[in-house]
Amino acid sequence: MRPRDGFVGTVGDTPLIKLRRASEETGCTILGKAEFLNPGGSVKDRAALYIIKDAEERGRLRPGGVIVEGTAGNTGIGLALVGNARGYRTVIVMPETQSQEKKDMLRLCGVDLRLVPAVPYANPMHYARYSGVLAEEIAASEPNGAIWANQFDNLANRRGHYETTGPEIWEQTDGKVDGFTCSVGTGGTLSGVGIALKERNPKVQIYLSDCMGSGIYNWYAHHEWKPEGNSITEGIGNNHETANLAGFASVDAPLQARENVGVVAARGRMLSSVRPGCGTMTARAASSPATTLPAP
């Protein structure tokens, strides 16, 4: 393996790993993109790097400046690590209900962490909305400026996956990929990878994996925002259309995974949480006409 160019050079280029149990049960080859091998431990490192690079290229982020974002955790970790490497400070707004491990990790990365109540998006104190207001307040007094990363509506998020994740999957499979699925929060991974793969082969099937408590499944299936049930999964699901999802019409089928099924899938040693567990269960169901995975 060749040496990487500094810390940010370690982001991306993650391997594909065959998920043996899921492959055996379906008779298909199901591969997982090992995004946990990114330095921040998640796929969100890619979005963080591209959001920061985009702000630098536009002249909106200067040395010593501040990055502000509202996040359930992983994007904040990525922004903090990349920001540290490039000389920026990071302020993160997070719902107080998120896991203690994420809070501890963010503080370990030197983040100025602001916790807010977990409220619906319509509430001005919703973590994503409040972070935008906070960014404006900090920018007014910060001599080196401050940016709002705005991962939900910043198309640099999608571009990061269009330029890296999608092409990596294509190259690592020698173009022999039949379908792709992932869970959705901002929509950057699904849309970026989906566009990249469809450009290379329009027959590649794109499946949207949504958790209970989110309205994205019903939006794509029935064109209405109608969440069902409750969610315990952190960082995925949504009840409004983000800019990264807007206009993305390449979803061949939306699928809905119940979280108790995701918990079962997450017991595999490579899967670290319910979130990738839901994605694995969706991959198992992709060849089935059913759109809701039954409880075990």
Show the residue positions of the predicted features.
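PLP-dependent amino-acid enzyme catalytic core
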Residues: M1-P296
